[in-house]
Amino acid sequence: MFNTHKVEIEWGGRPLTLETGKIARQADGAVLATYGETAVLATVVSAKEPKPGQDFFPLTVNYQEKTYAAGKIPGGYFKREGRPSENETLVSRLIDRPIRPLFVDGYKNDTQVVITVLQHDLENNPDILSMVAASAALTISGVPFMGPISGARVGYIDGEYVLNPNIDEMPESKLDLVVAGTSEAVLMVESEAQELPEDVMLGAVMFGHKSFQPVIDAIIKLAEVAAKEPRDFQPEDLSELEAKVLAVVENDLREAYKITEKQARYAAVDAAKAKAEEHFFPEGVEETEMSAEQFATIFKHLQAKIVRWNILDTGNRIDGRDLSTVRPIVSEVGILPRTHGSALFTRGETQAIVVATLGTGEDEQMIDALTGTYKESFMLHYNFPPYSVGETGRMGSPGRREIGHGKLAWRAIHPMLPAAEQFPYTIRAVSEITESNGSSSMATVCGTSLALMDAGVPIVRPVAGIAMGLIKEGERFAVLSDILGDEDHLGDMDFKVAGTEFGITSLQMDIKIDGITEEIMKVALEQAKGGRVHILGEMAKAISSSRAELGEFAPRIEVMNIPTDKIRDVIGSGGKVIREIVEKTGAKINIEDDGTVKIASSNGKEIEAAKKWIHSIVAEPEVGEIYEGTVVKTADFGAFVNFFGPRDGLVHISQLAADRVAKTTDVVKEGQKVWVKLMGFDERGKVRLSMKVVDQETGKEIVAEKKKEEVDAE
C-alpha cells in the first residue's frame, strides 16, 4: 500500500532520518523527519495556477507545535491548541527566510509549507529539524525550488564550536546561532551572543555551513528516488520589454533618486511611473505590448537596478551619503517623566519612542512550552503603526514582522541584563516606531538601551544596533552602513548587527545570491563594527551608564531569604497569613520555592513593615531579648502573650509584677499591649516570659530586677 523511501545519516552524534511515501500522500511533498527522538512532519502544497492578476509570490510557512508531542494536554478552557505562540511564529519566519529566495523568479502560485511537531524528546530542539524537513519536502515536491537547503545550530562552549547542542547544553553556551544555506552559499543567520568578537561570529557561520553539508547530500539522495516530476514552469523573459521601459524612465528615475527627502523622492518616482504608463498604455488603446502586471514587475526591477548602478558607479547613495556614513542621530532620555524610564531615539527619518516599565515577580510572563512551563522576566514589544511610514493600515494584535523584530531586539539586549539576584525586577520595554525609513529594529535596540539606563536598570554596557546592506555586481561590491528603507530590498545581503563596544550580542543576516565569500562578509562585519561604535558614541551624549537610583514612580523591591521549612508559616493556611501581610502593609510579596522573598512597593515604609512582619514569623526568639506583645488570653495561673509574630508564650502569675499578684486580671486584660522578656523554655519546650523585669512604660529592662534574677539563678 505504501511506497516508502527512507534516508538515514549520523549528524552531530545523533541519527537523522528522512522518510516519505507513507504519510500525507496527497500533498505535493511530505517528509517525516526524525532527529534523536524528536519527529516532525513537513508538507508542501502549491496551487497549479497563479491567481489572475497576482503580482507577488504568496508563500506561507506554518510551523506548529502539538502539545501531545511532549505528552501534555493544552491548558485553557477549550483544551486544544489555539493561535500560534510567539515561538511558533519565530520558527515559521526562521524557515521562511532561507527558502523564499530559492523559488524561481516569476513563480506566483499560492504555496503553503506546514511543519508539525509530532514528538519531542526534550533534548533536540525541533526548529532545525523542521527546516531540514521543509527543505526536503520542497525538493521532492516538483515545485520550482532551487534547493535543497539545510540549517544547523552552532553553540560556543569552552572556546569550541558545538554542532546542534542539545537543550540542556544551551545554558552553558556563549552563542546561540542558527545558520541556513545551500551547498554553495550561506543564506540566513540568526543569533544571540555574549559579546563575541566578529571573527568568532563569522567562524561560527562558516562552521555551521560546513557542518550541514551531509544533510544536503541526504536530501538529494532522497530526491533521487522519491522526487516528483518538476513542474513545467518557464520564467517569463521580460528583457526586451525591460530595455524599452528603461529607455523611457531611466533619466527620470536617476533624477528622482537624487532627492534626499523620502516623501519628495517617492512623489518623483510616482511621477516617473505615471509618465511611463502614459507612454505604454495610451488612453483608448486596448492592444498594448505588455500587460499592467508585466509593467509593474519591470518598473520595480528597474528601480533597484538604477539605485544599484548609482551606488557602484559613484559611491553615492540615495540620500547623498557615502557608503559608510551613518545618518544624523539625536538621543534623548526622560522624555516621559512619569514613566519608569523612557527614550526618544532618532536616526535620520527613523525614530522610536521606547518606554521601560519595572514590575515584580507577579508580572513575569508565564510561557507554556513543549519543554515545560517557565517564567520570563524580560519582555520587549515592538509596535509598527502605519502612520510611521505615512500610510493608513490595520491596527491590532502584532503581526509576524512585529514579533520577529521585537525578538531580534530582545536578543540584542538580553545578554547585557543584570542577574536576577542583582536586580530582581520584571522588565518590559515597549518600542513605538513613530517614523520609519530603514532599520527600525536597530533603532529599537538603541532606544531600549537608553530607556533601561534611564530607568536605573544596571545593564552591563550600552547596546547599539546598525543595519547594513551589500551590493555585488561581478567582482565589484559595496557595503552600505545604516541602510534606508529603499536600500533594504535592492541589496544582495541585508544584515543587522547589535552589540557593545566589546562585541556582538545579536547578528541577523539574509543573503540573496551566491558568491558572497567569507572575505566579503568579514569586510562587511568590520564596517558594521565601526558604525556600531559611532552610534554608541552618539547615544552617550544623552546617557552613558545606568542611573544610580530608580525613577521616582518605579516600585522598590527588596529581597530576603527565609528557611524553606518556614515558607508555609509565611503563607499560612489557604494563604491567610500572606494575604493579611499584603493587606495591612500595602506591599506586594512574592515567595519562591527556594525561600527567596521579594517585597515590592513604591513606599519604603511599606517594605520595611512587611520585612519586619515576615522576619517575626520566620526568626527564632532569643533568650534574654525584650519583645513587645499582646495579651491574647488570661488564666488563673498567668497570661498568654503573643510576642513574636504568631508565637505565644506564658507569663506566669509570679512574673506579672514585682509585687505579689492575687489575680491575673488585676494586672493585665486581653488585648493589652505589654513588654516581655524571654526567660527561656521549660522542659516541654514551652516559652517562659516575664513582665516584671521590664519597665512597662519604656520597654527597658529593670536593672535591679535583672541582678536579682541572676542571684536567684545561682
Swiss-Prot record:
Its cofactor is Mg(2+). Mg(2+) binds at D488, D494. GO terms for cellular component: cytosol. The keyword tRNA processing does not apply. Residues 555-614 form the KH domain. It catalyses: RNA(n+1) + phosphate = RNA(n) + a ribonucleoside 5'-diphosphate. Its EC number is 2.7.7.8. The keyword RNA-binding applies. Keywords: Cytoplasm, Magnesium, Metal-binding, Nucleotidyltransferase, RNA-binding, Transferase. GO terms for biological process: mRNA catabolic process; RNA processing. This is Polyribonucleotide nucleotidyltransferase.
